[in-house]
Amino acid sequence: MLNLKPPPNLVQNAAPAPRPATTEQRAVNPANYALVRDRVQQRLLAELSPSATRDDTMEVRRVIEKLFAEVVADLGLPLSRTDRADIFDLVLADILGFGPLEVLLRDDNITEVLVNGPHHVFAEHKGKLVETEIKFRDNDDVMRVVERIVAPLGRRVDESSPMVDARLPDGSRVNVIIPPLALDGPSISIRKFPKHALSPDELIKKGAMTPGIAEFLKACVGARLNIVVSGGTGTGKTTVLNALSSFIPEDDRILTIEDAAELRLQQPHVVRLEARPANIEGKGHVSIRQLVVNALRMRPDRIVVGEVRSGEALDMLQAMNTGHDGSLTTVHSNSARDTLRRVETLVLMAGMDLPLRAIREQIASAFDLIVHLQRLSDGSRKIVQIAEVQSMEGDIIVMQDIFNFVQTGVDAGKVQGYFTATGVRPKFYEKLETAGMNIQPSTFMPTEPLRIRR
């Protein structure tokens, strides 16, 4: 279990640790603690303006402090200064924030928060998924946090609509599913939005790639190759896509298309598009595919699709094959080769009756490079494979690995290994030269293992 204890005020089903009683300070027993907490919450929920947000402005905080003092006085219970502060912080989190989850959402070392009913809250801490000591009182307590998440978005979660995708004010992605579909109580999955996008240099420092690989990828983006970033869930695909996007020249017109906006491009000429779910009446849905089609009419130099997961794969291929070179996207898959099979399946989801060979020809013509990521057993994330998509031979798409990460073992829980070129110079090397990208042929020669220990 993660040794990340929230303060007593954030453990919803526990009283604070007993303190020695004196004439001026007495310990608050669990019953009194729960009474104070519930009365304060009820009073504040009834009297606080519905327009209050989790921004925690001084004005809203003063209102909460005033009502809190009145409730404590009405109850007539002696509270120590520490107990008073703990209860106040809890109420503040419940009213303006997300209750016991606040401590996790504010921790920069936490990247994902997973709630499995009221009594099991997990967090991804520095790449490892562990259970925390945070708990809710009951299912209703979890649902209050759910309502706090979806209400500002005009969404609802109930038996008729038991699943919802949402986004927190800071950009973090949220998925909620409730009973009767979730058998053990409401489930909340939060993927936190990083405060800043990792640069290529930061990825190098974290051991995700080498400086040589970064220079190669920079040249590929500069030469307007079409690149697919692939990997499983939580491998860092969006992070790497952000880093690759930083190599795009500032004078290019870039259109980004996402299901939930996560990309943070710094170039001046960026148009950000985001898909929209249907409203409560089931109307107004705008899909990624519709946005990709519309983007082609907006004179883009580059199209960056956050993730291809359905029929928009066909439109993305057509865009790449009709003059929109230098496009970038991500795909869920288990390897570079599996990425091609995955895209084949996604194209078929477009509903077009296309022969499999025709789809493969489109893929082979559109994709230049696949950058595959993996989360290793120690929680680290690395680019483990960079493969060139070359051509068709018969009915098979020919691929060739350019770089690999070779794992040699595990030492004290840390993955050991090294990055290496495969000794094969990509067929698009001349295209890099024509674009003025200075990549030495020696870049593609296997070298002495550069051992990475992170």
Cite the ranges covered by each PLM segment.
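N-terminal anchoring/assembly modules that precede and organize ATP-driven motor systems
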Residues: 1-130
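Active-site phosphate-binding and catalytic loops of NTP-dependent enzymes
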Residues: 52-54, 75-80, 96-107, 149-166, ...
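P-loop NTP-binding catalytic core
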Residues: 107, 115, 120, 124-223
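P-loop NTPase switch/communication element
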Residues: 194-205, 242, 246-293, 339-343
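Hydrophobic anchor at the beta1->P-loop junction of P-loop NTPases
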Residues: 229
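Conserved lysine of the Walker
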Residues: 237
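Conserved P-loop NTPase nucleotide-binding/switch module
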Residues: 258-271, 295-394
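NTP-binding/hydrolysis catalytic cores, primarily Walker-type P-loop NTPases
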Residues: 379-454
